[in-house]
């Protein structure tokens, strides 16, 4: 299977899951998120072991202390990650919320409502907790997500993604192959991925924008 075929297969699964999410009630989505929080706590030992392996490899490779720190899922960060999922579950469902209503002179009423994008691709660096944060936010808002993390956190991301996929199903897809080509294919997947969101340094963001054929929600210098 080529990189293009692999990425497209993930995106197609995500698109089918996004259609299913549109049929889910707020209570159903929230229940899944609470189940995810519980599952993360239950799997903490295995998740900690995966993260410890990433941290050890990063130190052995001579990566900067700042990067190693961002990579590390400390007990406090793990607890905050789990609590973050529960916090998202407790938020009001934004899907279908009426932002404004206007009545035209003709008598026609126009409403602006909040609706899901569909499939969101999120590419992030270093911090493995971003995977869980993003998955929770996307499912809450009715979006499926295709996630790609940094190579430094490969073991942590794979372990967290496995838990998220077990609970949230195909609404969460994880790009497990290395290399920049997979990211380029994600942002060129017209008709499969609706929007891409980079979370990382300026170099990553510019590379994604240069390759993109789909909309990219971006910043260059921070927000």
Which residue stretches match the model-derived regions?
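A glycine-rich helix N-cap at a beta->alpha junction
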Residues: 166-175
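Conserved small-residue-rich beta-alpha loop and adjacent elements
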Residues: 90, 94-165, 213-218, 223
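N-terminal Rossmann-like NAD(P)+-binding subdomain of aldehyde/semialdehyde dehydrogenases
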Residues: 1-109, 137
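Short, surface-exposed connector motifs at secondary-structure boundaries
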Residues: 141-146, 169-170, 186-193
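Conserved NAD(P)+-binding/catalytic subdomain of aldehyde/semialdehyde dehydrogenases
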Residues: 119, 175-223
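Short alpha-helical
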Residues: 46, 129, 155, 181, ...
């Amino acid at each position: 299977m080529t990189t293009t075929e692999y990425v497209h297969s993930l995106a197609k699964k995500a698109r089918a899951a996004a259609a299913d999410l549109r049929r889910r009630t707020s209570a159903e989505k929230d229940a899944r998120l609470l189940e995810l929080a519980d599952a993360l706590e239950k799997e903490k030992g295995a998740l900690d072991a995966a993260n410890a392996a990433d941290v050890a490899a990063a130190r052995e490779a001579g990566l900067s202390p700042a990067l190693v720190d961002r990579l590390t899922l400390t007990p406090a960060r793990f607890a905050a990650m789990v609590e973050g999922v529960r916090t998202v579950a407790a938020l009001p469902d934004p899907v279908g919320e009426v932002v404004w209503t206007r009545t035209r002179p003709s008598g026609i009423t126009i409403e602006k409502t909040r609706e899901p994008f569909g499939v969101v691709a999120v590419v992030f660096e270093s911090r493995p907790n971003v995977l869980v944060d993003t998955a929770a936010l996307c499912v809450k808002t009715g979006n499926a997500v295709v996630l790609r993390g940094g190579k430094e956190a490969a073991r942590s991301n794979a372990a967290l993604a496995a838990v998220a996929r077990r609970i949230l199903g195909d609404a969460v897809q994880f790009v497990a192959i290395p290399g920049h080509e997979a990211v380029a294919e994600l942002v060129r997947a017209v008709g499969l991925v609706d929007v891409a969101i980079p979370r990382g340094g300026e170099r990553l963001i510019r590379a994604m924008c240069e390759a993109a054929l789909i909309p990219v929600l971006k910043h260059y210098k921070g927000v």
